[in-house]
Amino acid sequence: MDKFRMMFQFLQSNQESFMNGICGIMALASAQMYSSFEFSCPCMPEYNYTYGIGLLIIPPIWFFLLGFVLNNNVSVLAEEWKRPTGRRTKDPSVLRYMLCSITQRSLIAPAVWVSVTLMDGKSFLCAFSINLDIEKFGNASLVIGMTETEKLKFLARIPCKDLFEDNEVRVAATRYIKCISQACGWMFLLMMTFTAFLIRAIRPCFTQAAFLKTKYWSHYIDIERKMFDETCKEHAKSFAKVCIHQYFENISGEMQNFHRHQSKDTSDAEEEEKQRSDEDKLLGIKAQEDMNKVLWNWHTCKPALALRKDHLDTESNGKLNGTMNGAVNGFAQGHTHDVAKKEWAVYYSKV
C-alpha cells in the first residue's frame, strides 16, 4: 500500500510521467478489450460492411476522445485559448504545441486498436466477404444459377462458420482476406512508425530556440495554473479557519474570556501567534467581495510576464555603490549628505 501511495504521489508530481502512464494503460486496455471482445458478424449483406468497418473506426474514435478527457492539459489549453488578453498576450505557437502534445498521446490507444484489429482480420473478413470472387477458391458450381441477391447472401455467410456449408471454400476465402488485412496492418504500423521518426528527425532541423520557447511557456502555463489552485486552496483553508474561529469567539465570548483569565500567558501568546499566522496567509484579502474581485481580475486581466526587482533594493544598492540606474549618481562618496554613511569593520584573524 505504501509503495502504491509513493508511486501515485510521484505520478501526481510529475505530470508528464502521469500522462505517459495513462497512455500506456489505455493502450493495454484497448488490446485487452479486443481480445475479450466477442466478435459476432451479422452475416447479412446489408450489415456486414457497416459492422466490420464500424468495429475498425468507432472504438478508435472513442479511445481518442477518452484520451482528451483524461488529459488535464485540455482544460488548460481551453482556458488559455478563450481567456481575455488583458496585459498578457497569447502566443499561438504555445497553443499549437500543447494541442500537438495532447493529440500525440491520445493517438496511442487508437493506433493500438487499429493495429490489433487489422492483424486479427475478423472485421476485415466481415466487411469485404461480399466482394470476393468465389471462382478463385474452387468449386464455382456453388454460385451457378444464383441471382445477384442470392450470391450476396451466400458470400455474406463466409465469416460465419456455422452457416456456410462448404468448409474448404470458407477456409480459403478467410485466409485470403486475413492475409490482405494483415498486410494493411503492417502498412499501418510502418506508416505510424515512419511518421514518428520524421517528427523526431525533422524537429532539430528547424529553429531549436523557437521549440524551446514554446515548450517552456507551455510548461509555465501548466505550472502556473497548479500553483494558483494550490494558493487558492491554502487561502480558502485559512479563510475558513479564521472565519470559524471568529464565529466561535462571538458565540461563546463570555466563556472564552473566563477560560482566558484562568489560562497561562504562554497559551494566550501561542493562540495569538497562530491566529496571526492564519491571518497572514490571507494576504490581506478578508472579504468575499474582495476575493471575487481578485478571481475575476485573474481571469480577465492576468499580470504581464515581466518580473522586476524591488525598487527599494535597487535604490539602496545604487546608493551603496555610488550608482543610480546603472550610472554614477553624482556624489563623490556615493551617498547624499543627509543620508548616514554606513560604517564597515574588517577583522583579521591571526590563527
From Swiss-Prot:
Segments of this protein annotated with the region Disordered: 259-281
Cellular location(s): Cell membrane; Endoplasmic reticulum membrane; Basolateral cell membrane
Stored InterPro entries: CALHM (IPR029569)
Gene Ontology MF terms in the entry: calcium channel activity; monoatomic cation channel activity
Catalytic activity: ATP(in) = ATP(out); Ca(2+)(in) = Ca(2+)(out); Mg(2+)(in) = Mg(2+)(out); Na(+)(in) = Na(+)(out)
GO cellular component annotations of the record: basolateral plasma membrane; endoplasmic reticulum membrane; plasma membrane
Residue ranges, annotated region (Central pore): 9-36
Swiss-Prot/TrEMBL GO biological process terms: ATP export
Activity regulation field: Activated in response to membrane depolarization and low extracellular Ca(2+) concentration. Inhibited by ruthenium red.
Domain of life: Eukaryota
Positions in the Extracellular compartment: 37-48, 125-177
Covalent S-S links between cysteines: 41-126, 43-160
Post-translational modification: N-glycosylated.
Keywords: Calcium, Calcium channel, Calcium transport, Cell membrane, Disulfide bond, Endoplasmic reticulum, Glycoprotein, Ion channel, Ion transport, Lipoprotein, Membrane, Palmitate, Transmembrane, Transmembrane helix, Transport
Region (Phospholipid-binding): 62-69, 104-116, 189-199
Cytoplasmic side: 1-20, 72-98, 204-351
Membrane topology recorded in Swiss-Prot or TrEMBL: Multi-pass membrane protein
Keyword Ribonucleoprotein included in the entry's annotation: no
Residue ranges crossing the lipid bilayer per the database entry: 21-36, 49-71, 99-124, 178-203
Subunit structure: Oligomerizes to form hexamers and octamers. Does not form gap junctions. Associates with CALHM3 as a pore-forming subunit in a hetero-hexameric channel complex.
Function: Pore-forming subunit of a voltage-gated ion channel. Has poor ion selectivity and forms a wide pore that mediates permeation of small ions including Ca(2+), Na(+), K(+) and Cl(-), as well as larger ions such as ATP(4-).
Domain notes: A phospholipid-binding pocket is formed between conserved regions of S3 and S4 helices of one subunit and S2 of the adjacent subunit. It may regulate channel assembly and gating.
Family classification: Belongs to the CALHM family.
The protein's name in its UniProt record: Calcium homeostasis modulator 1
Name of encoding gene: CALHM1
